[in-house]
């Protein structure tokens, strides 16, 4: 609905592409025709932080059992087929197998994200400010992890940082080519 012609203009997002990371646990439940449980990252921040690590499965199962955590159960097959249908209709959803990236990476550090097309899988460290320490491993399309945004004001700041970083990168790259 976000990218295709279904729904109304109010619930479509035409200028945004989607990258979905899927875990080994999801695939296991898909194959076994089981349900998957969906959580808000704000409900289970420890689970969100453990994404892509060995601790994720244990924390996930614990959150599923916890009565006080808001959650929604859905068929893993239904969800995956919906994702594949949207991908087939729009060509704009990219799927990353996060556990596979980490088990087959030549890096000791975790792969937490990728560029949109999923071909750049390098370790990254968060950047809080354009002059701060951190590590970016993306093409110049850039990316913002909206799951980490708590307040609307943060989005504007992150967008500014992303644009500045892209401009700085392309400017530095142009200087190197000219030199």
Segments from the language model and where they lie:
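Conserved, charged catalytic cores of large soluble enzymes
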Residues: 1-109
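Internal glycine-rich alpha/beta core junctions
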Residues: 93, 100-167
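Alpha-helix capping and helix-loop boundary segments enriched in small/acidic/polar residues
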Residues: 10-17, 70-74, 84, 129-132, ...
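Single conserved hydrophobic/aromatic residue that forms the stacking wall/gate
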Residues: 172-178
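Residue-level marker of positions within ordered structural domains that often coincide
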Residues: 31, 146, 176
